[in-house]
Amino acid sequence: MFPPTRVQASSRVVLKIFHFILVAFSLRSRRLSRLVLWLQFLGWLTWFISMWTQSVIYAQTIDCTLDCSLRHILTFFQTVSHAFIVVTSFLDGFRIKQDQLDEPIAFEDSDPWLAFTVLAMLVPTLGVEYLVCSNAPEYAFRIRIYHLKTLPSFLALQVQIISFILEVMKVNIRVRQTKLQLLILARELSCRWPQRKQKPQFSDQQAHRVKDLKRRYNDLHYLFVRINGYFGGSLLTIIIVHFAIFVSNSYWLFVDIRTRPWRIYAILLNLGFIFNVALQMAAACWHCQQSYNLGRQIGCLISKLVKPQGSKLYNDLVSEFSLQTLHQRFVVTAKDFFSLNLHLLSSMFAAVVTYLVILIQFMFAERSSTRGSG
């Protein structure tokens, strides 16, 4: 083994720190002792109960406007989603199964591209939170309380979807390696001398390689099944939360732009939230679309392995491999409710526009009723 380069060593440090962040937010608990699991769970449970209680009491003491209602909805969505992941992680820490997914982010990894992805996703998130904290005294009391309540859950959900993106990227690296091996085999079959191809030893050797590729493809499909099982529930809740954040901050951005004089920090803050959500959803859907496309490309390459003059065993293996790629697609889903791909992005954009128009209509209706009563 060669010693790691500086880039690999730095990447390993970044991924190791990211793993500790996952543990701190109770998003990973497989390697923790039971005492630590219980302490983490009770700590988060106390936080969630106290926050929900204060929100209910506060909501009953004031006359809630549309802006206030949106903040209560976002607080509920974000904290409930985080609580769901915490409970799932807590139960997963006591469950020992052979077929469960290992720690999704192994801090022994040193892939620079993974570390760069972590930094590219975390820096905008931390930048938005810096804007929130540095300008907190200028906000109204209800807005400061809203950001304080949602800060841990907001960061936890951001970190969780980043870990999901990294896991899909790691599997895609293996898929590309399998595709490369298949492409090499197809080129060898088309470039070797015809007399050598007629030998039984050559046919048996290629049949063994096809069988090995079939096994690799099956293992890759199983990795996607485990990703769906591990991240499916959290993905469903996170996508719902991200949709609500995108719609709400788009509405607040529209309100801030119409307000004179402009509040630059408020506009930048809403743009930051919108950018974070758009970046993470686009990255997740793009990498999942890449997984699906790579699987289809492997299926198309199998046609190049067909040998009319080959043995029956070889051609049967190629036919089975082709059927396997048709039935075992590399698809990532959120508990089978929907698949993550680029089509999901277009559907979400259309839904965002629809709900944004509805909120704007409610805003004008609320202001008209206020003026009428005044």
From Swiss-Prot:
Superkingdom: Eukaryota
Record InterPro entries: 7TM_chemorcpt
Extracellular side: 28-36, 94-112, 248-263, 365-374
Alphabetical UniProt keywords: Cell membrane, Membrane, Receptor, Transducer, Transmembrane, Transmembrane helix
Topological domains, Cytoplasmic: 1-6, 58-72, 134-226, 285-343
Gene Ontology MF term list: ligand-gated monoatomic ion channel activity; taste receptor activity
Tissue and organ expression note: Expressed in the adult labellar chemosensory neurons and labral sense organ. Expressed in neurons of the dorsal pharyngeal sense organ of larvae.
Subcellular location as annotated: Cell membrane
Residue ranges of the TM segments: 7-27, 37-57, 73-93, 113-133, 227-247, 264-284, 344-364
Its membrane topology: Multi-pass membrane protein
Record GO cellular component, one term: membrane
Secretion signal span: none
GO term, biological process aspect, one: chemosensory behavior
Any Pfam family hit: 7tm_7
PANTHER family: GUSTATORY AND PHEROMONE RECEPTOR 32A-RELATED, INVERTEBRATE GUSTATORY RECEPTOR
Function as written in the Swiss-Prot or TrEMBL entry: Probable gustatory receptor which mediates acceptance or avoidance behavior, depending on its substrates.
Family: Belongs to the insect chemoreceptor superfamily. Gustatory receptor (GR) family. Gr2a subfamily.
The protein's name: Gustatory receptor 23a
Gene: Gr23a
